[in-house]
């Protein structure tokens, strides 16, 4: 739609998305991470990187995907936390906008299916509510869809699913940082053999991730000072 030139900087969708990702960090509270215990942290912080790496390798070795940037963006999207991770990783590996759009589109399709199918399947096999919630939190992509799917099972499943996904969201920054290093030093390695400097990695690193971590630290500190009533 038509809008005057002076307002164009304020209607760039990219900045709204990045601002939303910074605000997403406000929900990652460290006291809740500790409260869920070792099993939940294991699912989010150990299984997720394994899935990310194995998905990327599968895309390169088996599917023979010609674009490594598309491959890693889809891998992060499907393994970490959906569009949020895709946006961060796409910035780190300098993926094309079309590749990011495709990754997010695939995520939305599978999320819509899993949001309905997983609760039904979990009920069918009789899995305990807490375990079902953890499974949903670790596999369904977007945070809102995780909450909706968990609510289908019950209040305990909702709480566990949302907490596992919240813990998983911490890996947005870690994934972006690791991808920035990998693509700068391995995928786009210089022909003259010269080492990639720290500035190149810094330029690749999506700066809104710092805001994400900052929001998490600030809100976690406030929550800790207020107590359990927050």
Which residues does each PLM region occupy?
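Transmembrane alpha-helix boundary signature
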Residues: 2-10, 26-40, 56-69
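Helix-coil boundary and interhelical linker segments in multi-pass alpha-helical membrane proteins
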Residues: 30-39, 122-131, 151-160
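Juxtamembrane and boundary regions of transmembrane helices in multi-pass small-molecule transporters
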Residues: 57-64, 114-139, 164-195
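Structural signature of multi-pass alpha-helical membrane transport proteins
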Residues: 1-12, 23-32, 177-230
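Alpha-helical membrane segments and immediately flanking helix-loop junctions
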Residues: 67-114, 131-154
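Entry/N-cap segments of selected transmembrane alpha helices
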Residues: 19, 24-56, 101-113, 230
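Transmembrane alpha-helices that form the ion-translocation and gating core
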Residues: 43-75, 109, 113-127, 222-227
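Cytoplasmic-side transmembrane-helix entry/capping segments in multi-pass membrane proteins
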Residues: 7-21, 40-45, 66-76, 98-106, ...
């Amino acid at each position: 739609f038509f809008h005057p030139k002076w307002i164009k900087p304020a209607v760039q969708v990219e900045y709204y998305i990045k601002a939303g990702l910074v605000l997403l960090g406000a929900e990652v509270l460290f006291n809740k991470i500790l409260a869920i215990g070792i099993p939940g942290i294991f699912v989010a912080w150990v299984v997720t990187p394994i899935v990310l790496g194995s998905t990327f390798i599968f895309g390169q070795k088996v599917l023979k995907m010609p674009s490594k940037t598309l491959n890693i963006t889809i891998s992060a999207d499907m393994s970490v936390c959906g569009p949020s991770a895709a946006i961060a990783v796409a910035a780190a590996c300098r993926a094309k906008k079309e590749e990011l759009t495709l990754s997010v589109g695939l995520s939305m399709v599978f999320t819509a299916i899993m949001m309905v199918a997983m609760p039904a399947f979990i009920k069918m096999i009789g899995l305990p509510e807490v375990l079902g919630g953890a499974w949903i939190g670790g596999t369904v992509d977007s945070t809102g869809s995780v909450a909706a799917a968990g609510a289908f099972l019950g209040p305990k499943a909702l709480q566990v699913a949302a907490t596992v996904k919240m813990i998983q969201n911490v890996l947005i920054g870690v994934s972006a940082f690791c991808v920035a290093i990998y693509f700068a030093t391995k995928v786009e390695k210089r022909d003259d053999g010269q080492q990639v400097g720290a500035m190149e990695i810094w330029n690749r690193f999506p700066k809104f991730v710092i805001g994400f971590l900052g929001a998490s630290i600030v809100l976690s500190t406030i929550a800790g000072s207020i107590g359990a009533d927050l």
